[in-house]
Amino acid sequence: MKLNISFPATGCQKLIEVDDERNVRTFYEKRMATEVAADSLGEEWKGYVVRISGGNDKQGFPMKQGVLTHGRVRLLLSKGHSCYRPRRTGERKRKSVRGCIVDANLSVLNLVIVKKGEKDIPGLTDTTVPRRLGPKRASRIRKLFNLSKEDDVRQYVVRKPLNKEGKKPRTKAPKIQRLVTPRVLQHKRRRIALKKQRTQKNKEEAADYAKLLAKRMKEAKEKRQEQIAKRRRLSSLRASTSKSESSQK
């Protein structure tokens, strides 16, 4: 079995092959996200504690958190699930994944060091890989350098050096996202003002429409009353003429 061990503090990662099955037997029957002492891996691993973060079986199927079995299952996966990347919007697919319990059928087991031991592991804890890119979001730059809201974030951006042969060295800085500038505040004020204007205009239009509707309803009511009165006059006139004719006979 191979062990893919990473140490987030230094940014290093190392793949080691374990020939003796007895050394990795401590990881058997353990679930993903379980913290295990790594003393059984060798003398140099004394005091180290690792967390099981995943793995792949001999056919390459990945372990999935929450699937409480040793074997393989076929699950209907969609966007947001691990072990699946949708190619189309709303696409779902039935994929084979391995359970989250470790056993001897794994080819690679992924481990993360959560506690460093007494000795250094060459290529893992003794060297540091610098991060290629710094934070881009304004709030994360503030968090990294412990800045207050009053401090100017633009002065603390991590710049990337671009050194080319025959050209003078220059640096490149990322565009800071979510940076609050006077222009952003002006845009926000304009948005709020436009929203207020729209609501005021909608209120005025609604009031005008209600007034016009009331006027039209009043006109229709008066017209209806006139028609009713006209019908009554005609019916009374007919009744009086028929009465006079009958009296003459």
UniProtKB/Swiss-Prot annotation:
Component of the 40S small ribosomal subunit. Plays an important role in controlling cell growth and proliferation through the selective translation of particular classes of mRNA. Part of the small subunit (SSU) processome, first precursor of the small eukaryotic ribosomal subunit. This is Small ribosomal subunit protein eS6. PROSITE patterns: RIBOSOMAL_S6E (PS00578). It comes from the Eukaryota. Belongs to the eukaryotic ribosomal protein eS6 family. Ribosomal protein S6 is the major substrate of protein kinases in eukaryote ribosomes. The phosphorylation is stimulated by growth factors, tumor promoting agents, and mitogens. It is dephosphorylated at growth arrest. The keyword Isomerase does not apply. Component of the small ribosomal subunit. Part of the small subunit (SSU) processome, composed of more than 70 proteins and the RNA chaperone small nucleolar RNA (snoRNA) U3. One of its GO terms (cellular component) is nucleus. The lineage of its organism: Eukaryota, Metazoa, Chordata, Craniata, Vertebrata. Residues 216-229 have a biased composition (Basic and acidic residues). GO terms for molecular function: structural constituent of ribosome. InterPro entries: Ribosomal_eS6 (IPR001377), Ribosomal_eS6-like (IPR014401), Ribosomal_eS6_CS (IPR018282). It is found in: Cytoplasm; Nucleus, Nucleolus. It holds the Pfam family Ribosomal_S6e. GO terms for biological process: cytoplasmic translation; glucose homeostasis; positive regulation of cell population proliferation; ribosomal small subunit biogenesis. The keyword Mitochondrion does not apply. Residues 216-249 are annotated as: Disordered. Keywords: Cytoplasm, Nucleus, Phosphoprotein, Ribonucleoprotein, Ribosomal protein. The modification Phosphoserine is found at S235, S236, S240, S244, S247. Residues 236-249 have a biased composition (Low complexity).
